[in-house]
């Protein structure tokens, strides 16, 4: 292990006031300490906010093309270090290497995408009702953005919050997840080398109870963007709104794939397996419910079980499905498996810890499939955040659609069908912010909005694409008479 990483505050790499650090271990081999990061407190977080406030005027008045140049250069530096970033991500979070490399590339693409937006922020010219008046609107930065990001996509999600925030002219304080902060530190390093002025970005590692809470409550921050669990996110939303902040939350999901009677069972099983077992099921858009028409139910289950049992589970460096990120996440998944069996669901694949030398020490769990699942069971209602798919049998499309909507979440949903009418009805009537036809629930394009319904997100603000800039800007209307 190298020396402990430092916080990035006001253009300097600094240690925490506490003098303490937190070790991060490899989820595939928990005895291996990968790195150590600052265990920061409220004062460290407050100092970061002070730096961001002090840098506001300089950054908001920096021409958009120059802001874009810095973002573009940072993206290029990240691209040059892609292999290194992939290794850090796999070592800290556990993702299979191809998944980690894909996530790093997404972060690179996000920086390049928003670099072009910095010089082209929205605004419109309107016709005035009287003579000798220019009437137009312009988008301006909101102020200091507090970003609190999760461990499951430790570079992509920080990138899709940070890049639009900076492009729009905001300054930023950022708290990455304590489990996997290494790639965020490297983003800060790239932006620093690209010429980002001091104080525009400040990264502080440490507990959410101290660093995150200070970011949210500090009077110097103007807006808060949080991605994480629904339970924590709802507390963040309440705290931030009570403090008068603009707030954006992206939270949990209980995402369905509806398999219609016209679907090819093998193709549907591929879609569900990719959506449910990819990234070890640790995605807010993972498919955790397969809602299957009775006519194709048996064939679909056989195909899905085959895919679950054939997945190569082991360290992300050289296996198809890596470990869960921590002992607590593994324990939670195993607890849900026990709950499902106790409630009467039938375990038809997986359900335990895999055996073998490659997996004997890590936080590994088998890809798991349950059948005979009632829609009211906890396994069909609550987010598991592991590679567990509950298969629910339905008699027709209308029943399947009703089951799909009968949860507290509404993030992503998909349908597998050859019936165009069914596909259109599903798009129209399913309660989800992301809807896919003949595709898995996971996987997003960076240039279109992302967000959910119900408990999955604060519906006012979307992330990514042009909509991703809206949260970080405020519109001003100008009447210029002459």
From Swiss-Prot:
Domain of life per record: Archaea
Database matches in PROSITE patterns: ALDEHYDE_DEHYDR_CYS
An example Gene Ontology molecular-function term: 2,5-dioxovalerate dehydrogenase (NADP+) activity
Segments of this protein annotated with the region Disordered: 1-28
Extent of Low complexity compositional bias: 11-25
Biological process according to GO: D-xylose catabolic process
Coiled coil: none
Deletion phenotype: Impairs growth on D-xylose as sole energy and carbon substrate.
Location of the active site: 284
Gene3D superfamilies: Aldehyde Dehydrogenase, Chain A, domain 1, Aldehyde Dehydrogenase, Chain A, domain 2
Involved pathway(s): Carbohydrate metabolism; D-xylose degradation
Pfam family, one: Aldedh
Keywords (A to Z) from UniProt: Carbohydrate metabolism, NADP, Oxidoreductase, Plasmid
Catalytically driven reaction(s): 2,5-dioxopentanoate + NADP(+) + H2O = 2-oxoglutarate + NADPH + 2 H(+)
Enzyme Commission code(s) on record: 1.2.1.26
Keyword rRNA processing carried by entry: no
Signals that turn on the gene: Transcriptionally up-regulated by both L-arabinose and D-xylose via the pentose-specific regulator XacR. Expression is repressed by glucose.
Subunit comment: Homotetramer.
Function: Alpha-ketoglutarate semialdehyde dehydrogenase involved in the degradation of D-xylose, a major component of hemicelluloses such as xylan. Catalyzes the fifth reaction in the xylose utilization pathway through dehydratation of alpha-ketoglutarate semialdehyde (2,5-dioxopentanoate) into alpha-ketoglutarate.
Family: Belongs to the aldehyde dehydrogenase family.
Protein's name in the database: Alpha-ketoglutarate semialdehyde dehydrogenase
Organism: Haloferax volcanii (strain ATCC 29605 / DSM 3757 / JCM 8879 / NBRC 14742 / NCIMB 2012 / VKM B-1768 / DS2) (Halobacterium volcanii)
